[in-house]
């Protein structure tokens, strides 16, 4: 097994050559997610799996607080609703095996992480704050608020080429 990182709109892979495609907190950065799903469908073998752990737009998306880890403002955020994601998956030729909302668990985890971040006297060696710098304190706070207020949701999706 091997891992490839590439442009999701133009994967350097032959048709029907992969057993699985994995996305984790990626779609929120992709302005043309329908085209990305079509590209995934192209490279997956028959019965290939698409696995996603993604942030989607919640019922109160208009109240989104920025910055967040994926976008400094609304112009750079490409969140879609869970219903839009389902529809795009089906239109791209996927059968949805499961679609689970993990938002409550994600919120609880993020709250625990925030508590650790504020208690630590020194920054952990590997952390989002290492990447984002001091901005991550605000991003993390906004992420917790957005999850708690229903502006975003976190979902797990398993789908099969069908």
Q: Can you say where each PLM-predicted feature lies in the sequence?
A:
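A short SAM/SAH-binding and catalytic strip from SAM-dependent methyltransferases
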Residues: 19-32
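A short acidic, Gly/Pro-enriched loop at the edge of an enzyme's catalytic core
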Residues: 9-21
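Conserved Class I S-adenosyl-L-methionine
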Residues: 100-162
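Short, glycine-/aromatic-enriched active-site segment of Class I SAM-dependent methyltransferases
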Residues: 55-76
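A short glycine-rich, Lys/Arg-flanked "PGG" loop and its adjoining helix->strand segment in the class I
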Residues: 34-49
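Adenosine-cofactor binding site in Rossmann-like domains, unifying the SAM/SAH pocket
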Residues: 5-7
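Short alpha-helix
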Residues: 77-99
């Amino acid at each position: 097994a091997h891992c490839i990182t590439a442009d999701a709109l133009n994967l350097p892979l032959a048709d029907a050559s992969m057993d699985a495609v994995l996305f984790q907190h990626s779609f929120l950065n992709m302005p043309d997610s329908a085209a990305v799903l079509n590209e995934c469908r192209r490279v997956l073998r028959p019965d290939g799996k698409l696995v996603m752990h993604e942030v989607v737009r919640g019922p109160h998306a208009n109240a989104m607080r920025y910055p967040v880890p994926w976008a400094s403002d609304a112009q750079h955020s490409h969140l879609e609703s869970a219903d839009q994601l389902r529809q795009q998956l089906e239109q791209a030729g996927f059968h949805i095996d499961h679609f689970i909302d993990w938002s409550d668990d994600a919120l609880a985890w993020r709250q625990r992480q925030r508590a650790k971040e504020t208690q630590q006297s020194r920054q952990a060696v590997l952390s989002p704050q290492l990447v984002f710098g001091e901005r991550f304190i605000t991003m993390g706070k906004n992420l917790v608020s957005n999850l708690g207020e229903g502006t975003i949701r976190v979902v797990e999706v398993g789908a099969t080429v069908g």
